[in-house]
Regions:
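Hydrophobic ligand-binding cavity/cleft-lining segments
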Residues: 1-41
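Intrinsic-disorder/low-complexity, polar/charged segments enriched in Ser/Thr/Lys/Arg/Asp/Glu/Gln
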Residues: 6-12, 19, 43, 55, ...
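Short beta-edge strand/loop motif at the mouth of beta-sheet-based domains
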Residues: 10-11, 30-67
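Hydrophobic/aromatic beta-strand elements that line small-molecule binding cavities or substrate pockets
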Residues: 13, 46-48, 70-76, 87, ...
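A short, structured loop/turn motif at beta-sheet edges
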Residues: 19-20, 49-51, 75-81, 102-111
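Hydrophobic pocket/interface hotspot
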Residues: 22, 32, 56, 74, ...
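Beta-strand/loop substructures that line and gate deep hydrophobic ligand-binding cavities in soluble
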Residues: 84-134
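Short, highly charged C-terminal tails/helix-capping segments
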Residues: 141-147
């Protein structure tokens, strides 16, 4: 019996900011609330207990007015290097997946790799890819050109 391979995605960005600054933007609620989300809509709230077993909870509003609430649990935390967390939508908790952020120092900044695994189907993978691309673009602008 073979197990079905669930869809995943991997995105990479080179950011003109230190791993410390990128990690802070991904983990500090007072920074997350300033930029988190896939489009120009606002982040309404951000909570993060950044330790293995700690939870995060983010509420953001899209420009079309839709409100989304991803939440999850931190599985692995290595400051300025790695962040692994479960990812679920408050409205669909049965669809838990796994997100990994890898931060690698490079000349001039940080290479950020985002891996989102265990997505339930191809449609979900495609929508998350679009969302993560928008979010990473916002992150690059938020932390870019800073030491």
């Amino acid at each position: 019996m073979t197990t079905k391979q669930l869809p995943s995605l991997t995105l990479v960005r080179r950011i003109k900011a230190s791993p410390a600054k990128v990690f802070a933007a991904l983990t500090k609620p007072e920074l997350m609330i300033q930029w988190w989300g896939p489009d120009a809509g606002p982040t309404l709230s951000a909570e993060a207990d950044v330790r293995p077993g700690g939870r995060f909870n983010i509420v953001f509003q899209l420009t079309n007015g839709d409100v989304h609430n991803p939440t999850g649990v931190y599985k692995d935390v290595i400051p300025e290097k790695k962040l692994v967390l479960t990812w679920e939508w408050r409205e669909m908790p049965e669809r838990e997946s796994l997100v990994t952020f890898l931060l690698e120092p490079i000349d001039g900044g940080t290479e950020l790799t985002l891996i989102h695994e265990q997505l339930p189907d191809e449609g979900t993978r495609q929508s998350h890819e679009a969302g993560w691309n928008g979010l990473l673009d916002k992150l690059v602008v938020f932390v870019g050109d800073a030491p």
